[in-house]
Amino acid sequence: KRALVVGGGIAGMTCALSIARQGHEVHLVEKDKELGGMARRIPTTLEGMDVKAYLDGMIRAVYHNPLIHVSHDAAIKEVTGYVGNFITTVVSEGRVKKIQHGASVIAIGADVYEPTEYLYGENDQVLTHIELGERIANGEEKVIGARSLVMIQCVGCRNEDRNYCSRVCCSHAIKNALKLKEINPEMDI
């Protein structure tokens, strides 16, 4: 039996590796040109783990596993069949493939909320936590040399449309604040 895993981020790759280690063939379908998903934009975890190194190791493991077939720049066009016997039509890098599989895993991840509040997109000093983390990692002087920084939490959520917590923003804020204080102890955050 074969499995189809949709999404080449950490969750999708972990799933593909697990299924392949059990001896099953896996077709891993990723919409981008590279594997890694959102993790490509996160340099470290709150605990200091090097996400890029972890991700690079996982990507190598996926490509070196002969039971895993990766489709990049891919889009699913059609799914037919029934439980245990599906045919999924995928367009990948200009080619059409029909993949027969018995199981599917959807691990499509998430997108960063692009705020409409607080002048985001209008003022280049207003960033998401992901963008701030990238700029800290790149050593951008405008960010790491700033005298003060304000972090506004729960932007775009905890309201009627999105009344939930993403459970990642606070840890990103703490991680970014700790890194900035390490680089620039005089910064007011």
What are these regions (language model features)?
Residues 42, 46-49, 78, 83-86, ...:
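A broad, structure-centric signal for solvent-exposed, well-ordered loop/edge residues
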Residues 47, 54, 58, 81, ...:
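A sequence-level detector of short, solvent-exposed, charge-rich linear segments
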